[in-house]
Amino acid sequence: MTENAYRNPLDIVTEGRTLPEGYDSWGIKSIGFDGKTRKGFEWPAPGNETQYYELLDHNSSCPRQIGDGLCVGTTWKGMASGGFRAFCLLLVAYRSIEARSDEVGKLRVPQAFVVARLDGERLARESFRGANLHGADLHGADLHGADLHGADLHG
């Protein structure tokens, strides 16, 4: 891999980790500091599964109503689509055979296992050095104090 090659942050976060029994794929979820997402859904603590939801008959990555599954990201862009910033993150596992998706980077699942709660800012500082930001939309980003030495900001 070249120095500036893109590497999905989810691959970095899951490196060396083992999926929980019965699960075959990793996902990432941004949540509020209170552990909740849209419409007040409260995610369980690490080491626990969410309730199982019957998915409605559509392939959308997003639930159409409460009880129509959970939206999980497989990329940072997909994770951020729920409107929560990457401060408080959950590393989750899901069963790929149950996932529905019509967008790259995010999907809808009937159940997820919460593996870990992550500090998004700390993770970025410690693990994402040398990130290739080619084409990144940084509109509105607070870059005060950011060390962008060597960052590829072309685009």
Which ranges hold each PLM region?
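Short, glycine-biased loop/turn motifs at secondary-structure junctions and
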Residues: 1-155
